[in-house]
């Protein structure tokens, strides 16, 4: 924190579907870039370690194992860093697979948050692969050698701020998890997302984030999936947005084919 401000960032890596080792290397490049810019909290898109569009490959244990190996590599890479990094990955629990955000700092897992609302209509079929946190009920999982509880609503406290996490479609729920998180004391909301792009959807999303950041009286950092995701059924525009109290502070260049 400097002069009462917290520098946050939304990093959109160039990824390869179902290639966690490549993806973690791209995320590491973004971390170094963010570190040079003094970023204190960096959020990446939904399922950034594996790619969002793996589809039935999420059922393969090999992919889940490779994602965990990639996370361990990222933990080693960030061991000497004060920056908080949030990445997305699938995590196997007692009743299925959870779509999770993993919070890292100084080489340690600070917490795991699972997605609440799984879109399952039109072009989306997340319930085919994932289980909502509503059904998991705060299960404990072994990840990278540690027994960690998967949470639904957690406020992470740092010396400079407090923040909470929601994922993708959670924002569009009648009562988003971020509303509860704000009432629990979260000053900043991080959203790991992989919302597909449609005509007019970008403007709709901006309005939703502006309204929610104003309603929560805080900051909102949105990182959307981008280049490298499969375009078989969907299009991703790598949208990244930062809002505060209903006002936009930063927005990236959409449809960029490079990491940013």
Task: Outline where the language-model segments fall.
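Enzyme catalytic cores with a strong preference for nitrogen-chemistry domains
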Residues: 1-260
